[in-house]
């Protein structure tokens, strides 16, 4: 069913029909389209814009269509122009002339953005729980690895000893911010545009606030031109999705490195690994690699919508039909990535001994030698110079700092005493960093408690 045609002398070319159709993309919004139509029909009846009988017949017809579509009795007609025309056409088929009254006082321009906002409200709410599920896994792994010492890196060079719990909690912080951004984005999605019409509202005495209440929106949009041409909320959602994928990608890169024989810090479960068609020994971290690769796909979705919107004058233009494919692809990709990544992290084996061995290489306790000298009264810059010389000598002699004799230490500075060996033990290096945010057991437990509280505050039961 076409929702237009009286002004035309002939039908559109079949190629144009195919080119113009969006039913394959927007059909996933059939529930939202019907929900919006139910609220609109109720308002039309309450405002005496259509008769009570017409409103009731439309309502019962829409509810029956929703039930039958949910049960698969009614299938989407892929020759329809879009989900809006399909639902209205199906309604008219079932209830006759009353169905033709549904579109009174609205346009597809405000209808489509209503559907999209309704869909996004549900999608964002669900996505936040996927993030919470990942946070729960990170919390579990962090609790198991409070005492697992590993090397921390800068510039991909070993820097200072930390713990695996500390490292995992760094990603937990990133995902906390992601959830916060989604919550903030939700506020701008949660505005009801129906009643804006094609661009200039309506001459009918419609009640936009009533529709907003029926549909669970916190408020109505304030400018009809902006309402039908606004896709900021979709772009903002894709921006949030892109940042989630960026964080997953960074984590994936480390997972991939840690799986190598060169690192051997973790082993992924067989259920989250793949093999090679030619090399029998291979166990590949394909999940992490795909997450890393799919990040570019979500970035592309964001750029698609930014590019679609960059040159559009007010108000609605058909270009905006391209918004949903990019948005839905981004949502689907992030949801699947989060769920799969969550399972990968939950089932991975941590090789604690290898992590500790790794922390013992690369002079990760060098900063602690300098701090030791400073605490003994030496200016930091002088201490830095002395320790640099110690490291250079150790490299030459192929030994670690803690392997130096007291005589060798004193050759670099008479400040050194026997307590240097305790000061540069890896466990001491970690546990002395008790500052808020640090890797010590005391600090990490505070971070774990904060994460527990965050999960409790945001998890839906």
Swiss-Prot record:
Supply the CDD domains for this chain.
Argininosuccinate_lyase (cd01359)
EC number(s) for this protein?
4.3.2.1
| GO MF annotations, alphabetized | argininosuccinate lyase activity
Q: Which InterPro entries match?
A: Arg_succ_lyase_C (IPR029419), Argininosuccinate_lyase (IPR009049), Fumarase/histidase_N (IPR024083), Fumarate_lyase_CS (IPR020557), Fumarate_lyase_fam (IPR000362), Fumarate_lyase_N (IPR022761), L-Aspartase-like (IPR008948)
In which pathway is this protein known to take part?
Answer: Amino-acid biosynthesis; L-arginine biosynthesis; L-arginine from L-ornithine and carbamoyl phosphate: step 3/3
Which compartment or compartments is the protein found in?
A: Cytoplasm
Any single biological process term in GO: arginine biosynthetic process via ornithine
Keywords, in A-Z order: Amino-acid biosynthesis, Arginine biosynthesis, Cytoplasm, Lyase
Q: Which spans are transmembrane here?
A: none
Q: Tell me, in one coarse class, where this protein mainly resides.
A: cytoplasm
What catalytic activity is recorded? 2-(N(omega)-L-arginino)succinate = fumarate + L-arginine
Provide one Gene Ontology cellular component: cytosol
Q: Which family does it belong to?
A: Belongs to the lyase 1 family. Argininosuccinate lyase subfamily.
What is the protein name for this chain? Answer: Argininosuccinate lyase
Q: What organism, scientifically named, is this protein from?
A: Clostridium beijerinckii (strain ATCC 51743 / NCIMB 8052) (Clostridium acetobutylicum)
- The gene designation is argH
């Amino acid at each position: 069913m076409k929702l237009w045609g009286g002004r035309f002398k002939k039908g559109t070319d079949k190629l144009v029909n195919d080119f113009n159709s969006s039913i394959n993309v927007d059909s996933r919004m059939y529930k939202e389209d019907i929900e919006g139509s139910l609220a609109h029909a109720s308002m039309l009846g309450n405002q005496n814009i259509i008769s009570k009988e017409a409103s009731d017949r439309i309502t019962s017809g829409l509810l029956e269509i929703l039930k039958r579509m949910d049960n698969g009795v009614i299938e989407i007609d892929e020759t329809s122009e879009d989900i809006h025309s399909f639902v209205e056409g199906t309604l008219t088929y079932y209830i006759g002339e009353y169905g033709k009254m549904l579109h009174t006082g609205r346009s597809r321009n405000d209808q489509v953005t209503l559907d999209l906002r309704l869909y996004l409200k549900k999608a964002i709410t669900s996505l936040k729980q996927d993030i919470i599920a990942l946070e729960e896994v990170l919390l579990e792994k962090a609790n198991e690895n409070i005492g697992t010492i590993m090397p921390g890196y800068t510039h991909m060079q070993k820097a200072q000893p930390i713990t695996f719990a500390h490292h995992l909690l760094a990603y937990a912080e990133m995902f906390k911010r992601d959830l916060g951004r989604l919550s903030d984005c939700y506020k701008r999605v949660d505005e009801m545009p129906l009643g804006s019409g094609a661009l200039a509202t309506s001459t009918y005495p419609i009640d936009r606030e009533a529709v907003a209440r029926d549909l669970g929106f916190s408020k109505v949009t304030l400018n009809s031109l902006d309402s039908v041409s606004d896709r900021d909320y979709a772009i903002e959602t894709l921006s949030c999705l892109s940042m989630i994928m960026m964080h997953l990608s960074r984590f994936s890169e480390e997972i991939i490195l840690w799986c190598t024989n060169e690192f051997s810090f973790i082993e992924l479960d067989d259920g989250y690994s793949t093999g090679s068609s030619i090399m029998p020994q291979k166990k590949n971290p394909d999940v992490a690699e795909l997450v890393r690769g799919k990040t570019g796909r979500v970035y592309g979705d964001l750029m698609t919508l930014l590019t679609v919107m960059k040159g559009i004058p007010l108000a609605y233009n058909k270009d905006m039909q391209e918004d949903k494919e990019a948005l839905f692809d981004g949502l689907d990709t992030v949801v699947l990535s989060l769920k799969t990544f969550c399972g990968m992290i939950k089932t991975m084996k941590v090789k604690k001994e290898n992590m500790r061995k790794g922390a013992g290489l690369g002079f990760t306790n060098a900063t602690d030698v300098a701090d030791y000298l400073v605490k003994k009264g030496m200016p930091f810059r002088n201490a830095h110079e002395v320790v640099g010389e110690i490291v250079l000598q150790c490299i030459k002699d192929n030994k670690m700092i803690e392997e130096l004799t007291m005589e060798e230490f004193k050759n670099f500075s008479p400040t050194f005493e026997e307590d240097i060996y305790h000061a540069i033990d890896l466990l001491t290096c970690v546990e002395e960093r008790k500052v808020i945010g640090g890797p010590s057991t005391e600090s990490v437990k505070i971070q774990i408690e904060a994460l527990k509280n965050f999960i409790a505050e945001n998890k839906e039961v």
